Amino acid sequence: DTFLHCCIESRGCQFSRKCGSCIMCDYGEGRNLHPDELRKELDERVSQYMNGLHTILIGTYGSIFDEDEISSACFDVILEFLAQYSIPTVIFETHCSTVNSNKLKKIRDKIPRKTKVIIEMGYESCDAYVLKYCLNKFISLEQLKNAIKLIHDYRMSACTNVLLGAPFLCERDQLDTAVKSVNWAFEQGADSVVVFPMNIKPFTLLYKLY
């Protein structure tokens, strides 16, 4: 199966701008695109890969549903672009706090019903201590549960990302918290879970500590 990850430039994650990024994140910041500019980029750079594609993941430097990164007009451009192609699976990557009925309804109205739509959300761990003190991750687990339910209300699939190898923990605790987090996500109704091994990337706080 062919897979394409399309990362759209943006001003960056709202949490990184306001209170510091997750300890392992190297997404950085860019600039927001004008709708006409985005349309041109999609047509010139992405369309060549669309025919015969099985899965496309649409993301940004932060959250695709965050209108401080991707304006409503730009989001419409993305949906109009995707609607031109018969792609079996479309994935939108976003923070759970940005999941709302307006965005999900737009997707349902634009994307063909036969297309499987997945909303992918990074939550990393169900352990509040790990989130706050090991990762500097700003997320409400209650908000994540509500997002999963809302996604299902619009007949879409919810995917959560779990981190394996949280810093400042011994190996046993790293494994235990990852297993607990996978199980917790499924208990809340997640349709799938992606486990990401910790990647020590340059220009991150984790890299400096390492």
Where are these regions (language model features)?
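Residues at the starts of beta-strands that form the adenosine-phosphate
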Residues: 21, 55, 89, 157-159
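Acidic (Asp/Glu)-rich catalytic clusters
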Residues: 45-51, 78-85, 105-116, 148-155, ...
